[in-house]
A protein has these predicted regions:
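ATP-binding N-terminal substructure of ATP-dependent carboxylate-amine bond-forming enzymes
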Residues: 1-80
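Active-site nucleotide/adenylate-binding loops and adjacent lid/helix of ATP-dependent enzymes
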Residues: 50-52, 58, 62-167
């Protein structure tokens, strides 16, 4: 069995090592693979595959991978099921909600808050920054801004995130 990593994605050592340990060979190129590890996919990426070939993303998975689209989905669920989706801090999607964000941070209880700004379509922690309440933000970049959680859940005194890779 063999797998191929397309040039549309970052190469994760955890993925390569797991696949090799499972008996897969890494191909440089070609069509004779069982699995292609790639970036976001469309239906056009999936249609040409043979029945023995699999792909690591399903169409429209950008709704889970892009931070702005993910927040829109979470926000819709917060409206529908407020009790179950109260764990996410309030977030604004920029540039569309830039004015709303600027108005919110002028409120007295928001002036001492810090905010975390993340590019909408970045990964691996690239471009993330923490800003003070009065620091000016660009209204031109696709990003999300959330109230910074200053006392998050920690494991061994460290912040963490959970990622799941299913093979």
């Amino acid at each position: 069995m063999a797998f191929y990593i397309s040039d549309r994605t970052h190469i994760y050592n955890a993925v390569v090592n797991t696949m090799k340990n499972a008996g897969f060979d890494l191909l440089e190129r070609g069509d004779n693979f069982n699995l292609i590890w790639t970036g976001y996919t469309t239906i056009d990426d999936i249609l040409p595959l043979n029945k023995y070939q699999k792909i690591n993303h399903f169409p429209n998975s950008t709704n889970l991978g892009r931070k702005d689209l993910m927040w829109n989905n979470i926000f819709r669920m917060k409206l529908k099921f407020p009790k179950h989706f109260s764990v996410a801090p309030h977030t604004w999607v920029l540039p569309g909600q830039y004015e709303e964000f600027e108005e919110a941070r002028k409120l007295k209880h928001m002036q001492d808050k810090m905010f975390i700004v993340k590019p909408a379509a970045s990964s691996c922690g690239r471009g993330i920054r923490v800003v003070q309440g009065s620091q000016k933000l660009s209204n031109k970049e696709d990003s999300i801004v959330s109230i910074y959680v200053d006392r998050p859940l920690l494991i061994n005194d460290k912040k963490f995130d959970m990622r799941v890779y299913v093979l």
